[in-house]
Amino acid sequence: MTVKITGFADEIAPELTAQIAGLKGLGMSYVEMRGVDGENLIYHTDEKVEQIKKTLDDNGIRLSALGSPLGKILITDDFTPHFEEFKRAVEISHKMECPTIRMFSFYLPQESDPAAYEGEVFDRIGKFVDYASANDTLLLHENEKDIYGAMAPECKKLMDTFYGDHFKAIFDFANFVQCGQDTLEAYEMLKSYIAYIHVKDALKSDQSVVPAGYGDGNVAVILKRLSASGFDGFLSLE
């Protein structure tokens, strides 16, 4: 398995200079950029984005993806302003020379049946994918608690409908554990669609996040299966 290591440097520090120091100290040359200098990358001005890009370039660090919050609004919220944020994120991804964006499939009302909102979810995701396709951008869907794609069956429905050059899957061990989803079952269901891994683990007992391999995510087993499959994407440390 030939993989590249990346990670969320805003868990080192909020400031870009400290993030870069931490990454270089770990021998890392990629970052999945989320928060930087006080807010998510997609909310910065063009001038600030250019400054961030130059600083990263000067230090030999590249983006593996934009760790955006896109799709992290209620499915009942107004989509129009959110879609404008999405278009801005696509623009920034190209400015950063990394047209790859982590995103989600919308929070659902508490204790609701995902099927009840499937039509609206798919309509919104379809608009994202159409725009991404027209603008040569890859969207990476992350399984996450309380969204439509929290469990493997719903993630597979999304992939069966939208998977392609512009829509692929992130596999997050801890998020599946925290949702009560068996990760081995999820992996077998989604393995054909996975392009990116979030290396994070959790305990079923209390849902606490623990170092990879110390929880119930079957991290070692799944990474071995990925290796055997020829996976060559990013492993992102979180």
Enumerate the predicted regions with their spans.
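Glycine-rich, proline-tolerant flexible connector loops at the mouths of alpha/beta enzymes
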Residues: 32-56, 106-112, 207
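A short, Lys/Arg-enriched amphipathic alpha-helix followed by its capping loop at the start of a domain
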Residues: 2-5, 22-28
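Short acidic/histidine-rich active-site segments
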Residues: 234-238
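Acidic/histidine-rich catalytic cores of soluble enzymes
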Residues: 5, 30-33, 63-66, 127-216, ...
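Short, conserved active-site loops that position catalytic residues or coordinate cofactors/metal ions
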Residues: 26-37, 64-70, 104-105
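Active-site acidic/histidine proton-transfer and metal-coordination neighborhood
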Residues: 14-21, 25, 55-58, 74-169, ...
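Boundary/entry segment of secreted carbohydrate-active catalytic domains
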Residues: 1-14
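A structural motif
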Residues: 28, 33, 61, 93, ...
